[in-house]
């Protein structure tokens, strides 16, 4: 499965567009609590633990999008967009949602 942020794959013309595919993953409020509890992990303004959780969430979302594309019979996803949203929760905290979307395609 070829995944690309571009709208075309060089040398592989699109034979058919199969539809929009998406994937989402949410980092729960406990991740933020753990993040701030482990503030000592921050080196140079970065937190390895938090970045690891973000990578994990992004991979879950990408895997979900890829699975959806395979179910449509696609062999590629083009125009992939990755977004990060903060979602407020009633208890006053927040969660982070990672969402990905793209167009499932059949390539030649």
UniProtKB/Swiss-Prot annotation:
It holds the Pfam family YbjQ_1. It comes from the Bacteria. SUPFAM superfamilies: YbjQ-like (SSF117782). Belongs to the UPF0145 family. This is UPF0145 protein gll1048.
């Amino acid at each position: 499965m070829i995944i690309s942020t571009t709208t075309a794959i060089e040398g592989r013309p699109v034979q058919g567009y199969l539809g929009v595919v998406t994937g989402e993953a949410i980092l729960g409020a406990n991740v933020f609590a753990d993040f701030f509890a482990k503030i000592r992990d921050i080196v140079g303004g970065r937190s390895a633990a938090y970045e690891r959780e973000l990578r994990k969430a992004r991979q879950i979302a990408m895997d979900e999008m890829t699975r959806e594309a395979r179910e449509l019979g696609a062999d590629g996803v083009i125009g992939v967009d990755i977004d990060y949203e903060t979602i407020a929760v009633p208890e006053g905290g927040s969660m982070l949602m990672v969402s990905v979307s793209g167009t499932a395609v059949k390539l030649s």
